[in-house]
UniProtKB/Swiss-Prot annotation:
InterPro entries: AAA+_ATPase, G_ENGA, GTP-bd, GTPase_Der, KH_dom-like, KH_dom-like_a/b, P-loop_NTPase, Small_GTP-bd
Binding site for GTP 2: 209-216, 256-260, 321-324
Matching HAMAP family: GTPase_Der
Protein known as: GTPase Der
């Protein structure tokens, strides 16, 4: 294996399989969340930590984006840095939104960096976030950003008032003080993430979808009708997070149910608030039920939520809610919309339900079980390559640049979701990879789970001698 991930000889295969298997079994890296109000330099700090420009940075308050996680490495230690993004706030909604950001970070991170603008000083929003973080019991580091002079460093000292201990004066833009901050953060991190889901225990389910699609109603129907709520599991000092519900002779953990039960206010930025909640629930789940309003046209927001689930690699069940409101004409129109808008999701089990009346709600359990079984599936290397040989012989990859790439070998690098690596002599077009995914599903099932197909191109034999 070469430094850039290409490979040079068939003798590398066993080593590559071992390497991939080790990576798949590696314990989850600890997570550091970067939080703070808009325009304090969160994304700039994330980019500085990563050593590359990944997070969106714009010199205006509230570049509206979603929370994103990146793999990072510092002094030989792996960790994940979580950029909590920004929003377009107004004075009325800002404090609530920063507080929500902090509470999500408490649940999803092992340590938190609160970024404050040292030139502005502590604001009421900063104070609200600090109060929540202080109650978390997790390591919290105060980064006093935009410190580019001795005077600014003196201003940073005033941030002691937040009660988070000594402020760390930094300049995310120029790198000043960031190394010292990171050294302290990593010294406080556990070797293995303490917030990552542990194997075993009840399977974790998230109910997500656009506002007013019926998430709370479905949760109440599942819990109330079955009379089977075991208890609410205390998650943080802010609110209970998960609910354990017995369905189909097993207990399921429905994650972030506090977010479903609390109504989101009409303050500016509430869409970001909902997006943070959705990301948090998806990250914590193994299988995600995406609720879609069957009585109304599919929306861009529906598509965004579905994209979040696919990108996170979670098992997926589609629940078309409000079926009691759907007449025959709407059903025909909906089928056409699904064929047009969700053509890439034909693998996801679909259940037509009414959370209000309870129609077909019981069918969600077998759909979740099917999706999770697929999500957990591993295909042995022998059968996988026998299948691949037949498929490629019947439909070889298209010619690219006058040459036809050959697929020499395949292995499943991971499950949850099933992830495959193809070793080739050249690049494979996206269309051909989609074709292989369809054939994989035909041969091995995978109903209810995304599949990832990665390509590693073999290095030319003379490349390493040049």
């Amino acid at each position: 294996m070469t430094h850039d991930g290409t490979w040079s000889d068939e003798s590398d295969w066993e080593a590559v399989e071992f390497e991939l298997d080790e990576a798949a079994q590696a314990p989850p890296a600890p997570v550091v969340a970067v939080v703070g109000r808009p325009n304090v330099g969160k994304s700039t700090l994330v980019n500085r930590i990563l050593g590359r420009r990944e997070a969106v940075v714009q010199d205006v308050p509230g570049v509206t984006r979603d929370r994103v996680s990146y793999d990072a490495l510092w002094t030989g230690r792996r960790f994940v840095v979580q950029d909590t993004g920004g929003w377009e706030p107004d004075a009325k909604g800002l404090q609530q939104l920063v507080a929500e950001q902090a509470s999500v970070a408490m649940r999803t991170a092992d340590a938190v960096i609160l970024v404050v603008d040292a030139l502005v000083g502590a604001t009421t929003a900063d104070e609200a976030a600090a109060r929540i973080l202080l109650r978390s019991g997790k390591p919290v580091f105060l980064a006093a950003n935009k410190v580019d002079s001795d005077k600014a460093e003196a201003d940073a000292a005033m941030l002691w008032s937040l009660g988070l201990g000594e402020p760390h004066p930094i300049s995310a833009m120029h790198g000043r003080g960031v190394a010292d901050l990171l050294d302290e953060v990593l010294a406080a991190l556990p070797e293995v993430s303490e917030v990552a889901p542990r194997p075993g225990g009840p399977r974790r389910v998230a109910l997500v979808g656009k506002p007013n699609v019926g998430k709370s109603s479905l949760l109440n129907k599942l819990a109330g009708d079955q009379r089977s709520v075991v208890h609410d599991v205390a998650g943080t000092t802010v609110d209970p997070v998960d609910s354990l519900i017995e369905l189909g002779d097993r207990v399921w953990r429905f994650v972030d149910t506090a977010g479903l039960r609390r109504k989101v206010g009409q303050a500016s930025g509430h869409e970001f608030y909902a997006s943070v909640r959705t990301h948090s629930a998806i990250d914590a789940a193994e299988v995600v039920i995406v609720l879609i309003d069957a009585s109304a046209p599919l929306t861009e927001q529906d598509q965004r939520v579905l994209s979040m689930v696919i990108e996170a690699g979670r098992a997926l069940v589609l629940a078309f809610n409000k079926w009691d409101l759907v007449d025959e004409d709407r059903r025909e129109l909906l089928e056409r919309e699904i064929d047009r808008e969700l053509v890439q999701l034909r693998w996801a089990p679909r259940v037509n339900i009414s959370a209000k009346t309870g129609r077909a709600v019981a069918k969600l359990v077998p759909a979740m079980e099917t999706a999770l079984a697929s999500w957990d599936t591993r295909i042995a290397t022998g059968p996988l390559n026998s299948w691949l040989k037949e498929v490629v012989a019947a439909t070889p990859p298209p010619v690219r640049g006058g040459k036809q790439p050959r697929i020499l070998f395949a292995t499943q690098a991971a499950a949850r979701p099933p992830t495959f690596v193809l070793f080739t002599t050249g690049f494979l077009e996206a269309g051909y990879r989609r074709f292989l995914e369809r054939r994989l599903r035909e041969a091995f099932g995978f109903e209810g789970t995304p599949i990832r197909i990665n390509v590693r191109v073999r290095e030319k034999r003379g490349a390493r001698r040049r």
